[in-house]
């Protein structure tokens, strides 16, 4: 047994008393569902709730397939020392996952230069750092629900919307020095020097505000509400800060800029059959999500950066988007957690990165098909060998689609590390799926590999429904809308080449800067750590309603 394997510690803990490489095991001797402290808690609550609601049947673990035929495994959240029950990684049971999704949905970036040009050129009003600071005070009053223009306007209780605020950033160091530090996202402080210079060169002298609409708003409404909520308060705040007349024609320009022209949303609108507005998970492109995650600011390890992106994306795309928005089921959690528990994907990715570093060097070779074939084959065969050598590893990833996703993710990321190219990376993924199917005759459930069979040819297509650079693809890309166990890993492959190159951002420098924000409840520098805290019930979310409900409820 090779003790260097990253996943062995977790396997020994999960299957205590069984060697990871043991070929034989036992069944029906572990206590059934009662071996799980969480399921016992569920049962106790369910009995009380059933009585409370007049005997209407409720949760009963004795219904259906017998639970606990084997060990009901704990899961180690990869990159942490936290062992948690699988139930606590379901997004409904995990406040951190909920907050991560909310923090994305409630964010909108709005350019300020159009509004400033209207003020100066149409209205003859001077815009200075002092007036910008005054405006930012006004928007931080109005955005949470404070009135600024009219009397007799109802307002929102600040205690319900403490998480709501607006911040500002710019690529102009001179302007940044003059802005109120309380509301400034300081690129020079938040990013390593080389990354900061790269970001500022892209942003230039332009100025942007980042608005965080209250969590409770996106819980009650949806992501499509966010730009409207933001725009209304922007208009009111400009009127207040610059002493404008609410009815004059120039106000229409503010409205157009705040609602449309200068708006950067986190996700695009969905087609009618999926019926979701902008800023919903299904519209978040893979490169956009890679920029939302902030690990690249604090780590120069390409594998770690990519793994953190995959973990957060697993919760967003597989658990919440496909698992609930699109499917409505509870079973998608296990597909997602395969990518961020028990250090299994970590082991495969670090093996691949070491192979690449030794043979090619990080970003040390051109993206050719020979390189894709070599790296993807090596990493895929290594991954499959681990499942064959360690039966407990096979039991941990009990589904073929879990194994296919994890092996292919490692192959794709490793190929991207070598080439600094996401197209090569995604072709590494596609080759891995084909190799895996050749080895095992199948991957996962029927149709799991539909998108993988046509993927390589589409990666080089220019047809609008087939070809798109990988970073700009997302859950809404036609062939990617089908199956679980793909989208999170695609996000990691979008991140991997940029992490290898040391890029400051993946797709959009504005989104990268907007989430370099220490005041967000979810820690985007370390999604796995936050998710673990949520599973351990140690994460404090935003948007709670205690102030307006009866005490003791």
Curated annotation (Swiss-Prot):
SUPFAM superfamilies per UniProt: Methyl-coenzyme M reductase alpha and beta chain C-terminal domain (SSF48081), Methyl-coenzyme M reductase subunits (SSF55088)
In-chain residues carrying the UniProt-annotated modification 5-methylarginine: 274
Name assigned to this protein: Methyl-coenzyme M reductase II subunit alpha
Entry keyword set: Metal-binding, Methanogenesis, Methylation, Nickel, Transferase
EC number from the UniProt entry: 2.8.4.1
Disulfide partners: none
UniProt record, GO biological process: methanogenesis
Residues that bear Pros-methylhistidine: 260
Enzyme class, UniProt record, top EC level: transferase
PTM notes: The alpha subunit contains six modified amino acids near the active site region. Is methylated on His-260, Arg-274, Gln-402 and Cys-454, probably by the action of specific S-adenosylmethionine-dependent methyltransferases. Also contains a thioglycine at position 447, forming a thiopeptide bond. Contains a didehydroaspartate residue at position 452. The methylation on C5 of Arg-274 is a post-translational methylation not essential in vivo, but which plays a role for the stability and structural integrity of MCR.
Annotated residues for binding of coenzyme M: 335, 446
Modified residues (1-thioglycine): 447
């Amino acid at each position: 047994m090779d003790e260097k394997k990253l996943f062995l510690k977790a396997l020994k803990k999960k299957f205590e008393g069984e060697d990871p490489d043991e070929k034989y095991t036992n069944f029906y001797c572990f206590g059934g569902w009662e071996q799980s402290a969480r399921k016992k808690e569920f049962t106790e609550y369910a009995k009380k709730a059933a009585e409370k609601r007049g005997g209407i049947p409720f949760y009963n673990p004795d219904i259906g397939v017998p639970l606990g035929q084997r060990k009901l495994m704990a899961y180690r959240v990869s990159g942490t020392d936290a062992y948690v029950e699988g139930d606590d990684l379901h997004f409904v049971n995990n406040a951190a996952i909920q907050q991560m999704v909310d923090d994305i949905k409630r964010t909108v970036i709005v350019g300020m230069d159009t509004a400033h040009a209207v003020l100066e050129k149409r209205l003859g009003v001077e815009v200075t750092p002092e007036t910008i600071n005054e405006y930012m005070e006004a928007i931080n009053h109005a955005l949470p629900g404070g009135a600024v223009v009219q009397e007799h306007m109802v307002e929102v209780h600040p205690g319900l919307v403490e998480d709501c605020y607006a911040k500002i950033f710019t690529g102009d160091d001179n302007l940044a020095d003059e802005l109120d530090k309380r509301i400034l996202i300081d690129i020079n402080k938040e990013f390593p020097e080389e990354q900061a210079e790269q970001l500022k060169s892209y942003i230039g002298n332009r100025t942007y505000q980042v608005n965080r609409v209250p969590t409770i708003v996106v819980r009650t409404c949806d992501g499509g509400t966010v730009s409207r909520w933001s725009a209304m308060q922007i208009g009111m705040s400009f009127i207040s800060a610059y002493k404008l007349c609410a009815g004059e024609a120039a106000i229409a320009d503010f409205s157009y800029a705040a609602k449309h022209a200068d708006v950067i949303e986190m996700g695009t609108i969905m087609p009618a059959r999926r019926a979701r507005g902008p800023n919903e998970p299904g519209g978040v492109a893979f490169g956009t999500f890679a920029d939302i995650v902030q690990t690249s600011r604090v780590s120069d390890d390409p594998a770690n950066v990519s793994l953190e992106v995959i973990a957060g994306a697993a919760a967003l795309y597989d658990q919440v988007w496909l698992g609930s928005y699109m499917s409505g089921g509870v079973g998608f959690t296990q597909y997602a957690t395969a990518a961020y528990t028990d250090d299994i994907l970590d082991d495969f990715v670090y093996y691949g990165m070491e192979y690449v570093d030794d043979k090619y060097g990080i970003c040390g070779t051109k993206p050719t098909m020979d390189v894709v074939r070599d790296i993807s084959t090596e990493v895929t065969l290594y991954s499959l060998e681990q499942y064959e050598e360690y039966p407990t590893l096979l039991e941990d990833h009990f589904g073929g689609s879990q194994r296919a996703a994890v092996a292919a993710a490692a192959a794709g990321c490793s190929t991207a590390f070598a080439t600094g190219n996401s197209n090569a990376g995604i072709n590494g993924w596609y080759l891995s799926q084909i190799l895996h199917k050749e080895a095992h005759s199948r991957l996962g459930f029927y149709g799991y590999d539909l998108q993988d069979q046509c993927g390589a040819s589409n990666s080089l297509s220019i047809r609008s429904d087939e070809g798109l650079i990988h970073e700009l693809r997302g859950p809404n890309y036609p062939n990617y809308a089908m199956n679980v166990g793909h989208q999170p890993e695609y996000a990691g492959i979008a991140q991997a080449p940029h992490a290898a190159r040391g890029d400051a951002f993946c797709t959009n420098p504005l989104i990268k800067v907007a989430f370099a924000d220490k005041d967000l409840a979810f820690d985007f520098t370390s999604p796995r750590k936050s998710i673990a805290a949520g599973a351990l019930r140690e994460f404090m979310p935003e948007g709670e309603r205690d102030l307006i409900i009866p005490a003791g409820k």
